[in-house]
Amino acid sequence: MPELPEVETTKQGIKPHLEGRMITAVQVRNRKLRLPVPLNLNELCQGKHITAITRRGKYILLHMDKGYLLIHLGMSGHLRIVSQTANPQKHDHVDLHINNGLALRFCDPRRFGLFIYIDENPYQHPLLAHLGPEPLSDDFNSEYLLRKAANKSQSIKSFIMDSQIVVGIGNIYAAESLFLAKIHPNTSAKKITTEEFNSLTGHIKKILESAIEAGGTTLRDFYSSDGKPGYFRFALKVYGRKNLPCLVCENKIETVVIAGRHSAFCPHCQPIIT
């Protein structure tokens, strides 16, 4: 699933082509996404100008002079900028035509994403209203996590992947951050010390910033808006490296299933706290 760096990379990639431009048409080929694409999306958007493009967690918001488009890439989606005459591929579901001859094309093979119109304040929409702070913001710090973790028996990995605690951290960056902080992913959140939270928040911020600079992590379906892969996969320390030697201690990387997800870790560098 595209995580915060992939979504931020996408936002930065589409922004120069769309911001300040007028939408001339919306072409919908398949409405059946996680939430149905509105039947009248063309009428809602045609003739409107895109005034800003922002990100909230894993959501991209296209601000128009009236209304908003809320986009989520789902499990396997991506946005790319194409010529309006470019032939669509099998899973290209929505085209947003702009008055510069280009189109924003939404591809989603597994159709877990969304492309919806919001009339009112988008931050009060049920999908956004209860999201936690951005991990790269000053609000996300060790004191905040320590307060939220009090009496939480869930694993620290599940804790930092909870979008109501902090947004945008998925399986890849959770595993990598916990490795660098030397915290076992199955450790109970309430057992994490202030010092460990200091380390963890610092590593989360550094990893996300590095991943954004590298254009995200391409493992299967993610490509940036210009069709290029992300290169942060070459910097991964534990994710996708099961049974390979740890790059620090040379012990074998192992995985454990936490909340239905395989979590990679080094048993030597990340001892479990009992």
Swiss-Prot record:
Annotated residues for binding of DNA: H91, R110, K152
SMART domains cross-referenced by the UniProt entry: Fapy_DNA_glyco, H2TH
Annotated keywords: DNA damage, DNA repair, DNA-binding, Glycosidase, Hydrolase, Lyase, Metal-binding, Multifunctional enzyme, Zinc, Zinc-finger
Catalytic activity, EC: 3.2.2.23, 4.2.99.18
Pfam families in alphabetical order: Fapy_DNA_glyco, H2TH, zf-FPG_IleRS
Record: active site: P2 (schiff-base intermediate with dna), E3 (proton donor), K58 (proton donor), R261 (proton donor)
Names of the cofactor(s): Zn(2+)
TM segment ranges: none
PROSITE patterns: FPG_CAT, ZF_FPG_2
UniProt GO BP: base-excision repair
InterPro entries: DNA_glyclase/AP_lyase_DNA-bd (IPR015886), Formamido-pyr_DNA_Glyclase (IPR020629), FPG_cat (IPR012319), MutM-like_N-ter (IPR035937), Ribosomal_uS13-like_H2TH (IPR010979), Znf_DNA_glyclase/AP_lyase (IPR000214), Znf_FPG/IleRS (IPR010663)
Recorded GO MF terms: 8-oxo-7,8-dihydroguanine DNA N-glycosylase activity; class I DNA-(apurinic or apyrimidinic site) endonuclease activity; damaged DNA binding; zinc ion binding
UniProt keyword Metal-binding, yes or no: yes
Cofactor note: Binds 1 zinc ion per subunit.
Recorded catalytic activity of this chain's protein: Hydrolysis of DNA containing ring-opened 7-methylguanine residues, releasing 2,6-diamino-4-hydroxy-5-(N-methyl)formamidopyrimidine; 2'-deoxyribonucleotide-(2'-deoxyribose 5'-phosphate)-2'-deoxyribonucleotide-DNA = a 3'-end 2'-deoxyribonucleotide-(2,3-dehydro-2,3-deoxyribose 5'-phosphate)-DNA + a 5'-end 5'-phospho-2'-deoxyribonucleoside-DNA + H(+)
Zinc finger (FPG-type): 237-271
Claim: DNA-binding is one of the keywords in the record: yes
UniProt superkingdom: Bacteria
Function, as annotated: Involved in base excision repair of DNA damaged by oxidation or by mutagenic agents. Acts as a DNA glycosylase that recognizes and removes damaged bases. Has a preference for oxidized purines, such as 7,8-dihydro-8-oxoguanine (8-oxoG). Has AP (apurinic/apyrimidinic) lyase activity and introduces nicks in the DNA strand. Cleaves the DNA backbone by beta-delta elimination to generate a single-strand break at the site of the removed base with both 3'- and 5'-phosphates.
Oligomer and partners: Monomer.
Family membership: Belongs to the FPG family.
Name of the featured protein: Formamidopyrimidine-DNA glycosylase
Phylogenetic classification of the source organism: Bacteria, Pseudomonadati, Pseudomonadota, Gammaproteobacteria, Legionellales
